Amino acid sequence: IDMTVGTSYTAVGEALSAGSADIGFISGGNYVLFSDDCDVLLTALRYAINKDSENPADWNDGTIEENTKDMSTYYRCIILAGPSEKGQELQAKVNAGEELTWDDLNSATWSVLSPTSASGYIYPCLWLQDHYGKGISDLEHVVQSDSHTTSVARLAAGQVDVMVSFGHIRIKNAPKWETELGGTAPMVEQTGVIGVTEGIYNDMIAYSKNSDTMADENFRKALGESFIEIADTDEGREIISVFSQVGYTWGQDSDYDGERAAQELLKSLEG
């Protein structure tokens, strides 16, 4: 076995594309850039949270999300409304089972991150496009924050009505919502989910289509099974924890179609 450390996910993708590497650990975003020359072997598993519904009202059950020991191949992003009058209005509508209109969302002030942020911009933008045929750039009131924590603080202070982030954002911030972030009541009482994106698949182990070694399907199967078994040991879990991964399962190219849509959106924004 000859192992090298890539200087970046892009460098790993280039090595797979050239056939100078047989397999590589790579992000979904970089995979779709090089998927003509590589394919998915395994998708990484991470610990899931206890809420996974695409119906936002299901998240508003009076409890903060919790980490579980269940493993998942993906995570979701959420659109979170806060304690402002408009934020509460949007939450009430969702919890009553009503569909939010574009005018509802456009009347709110949003906090987003930079356009390269997956959970802070790209996937919430795709959610808007899927549901309303519009994007974040079409919203009239948008504030760009430098971090998810800044977005949460602005939400708590009522400076914005809505923020976008990863699905476990409240787990991290609920303990300091009142003490550090400016909330006036528990976070679970002052915030509510009003939108949930499709699942965003985790990083992967990809193999090169230009590798003679990986051309053998039986070898690929044996190699994949080896990684799955290694990750199922204490020593293996410790090694892959550097990637925040807890295991592997078989993956397929179509799992990353959402990432392809994200890359197309990114290209259009940069264009």
Q: Where does each model-flagged region fall?
A:
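Pocket-lining segment of extracytoplasmic ligand-binding domains
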Residues: 94, 98-101, 106-216
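Extracytoplasmic/secreted proteins, especially bacterial periplasmic and envelope-associated proteins
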Residues: 11, 15, 20, 29-33, ...
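Periplasmic-binding protein-like
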Residues: 43-78, 180-221, 241, 245-247
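Beta->alpha turn/N-cap motifs
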Residues: 5-9, 19-32, 36-38, 42-48, ...
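Surface-exposed patches in mature extracellular/periplasmic domains of secreted proteins
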Residues: 2-6, 136, 141-142, 235-242
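An extracytoplasmic/periplasmic, membrane-proximal ligand-sensing/linker region
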Residues: 217-271
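A conserved helix-loop-strand patch within extracytoplasmic ligand-binding domains
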Residues: 45-118
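Short loop segments at secondary-structure junctions
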Residues: 3, 82-87, 209-213
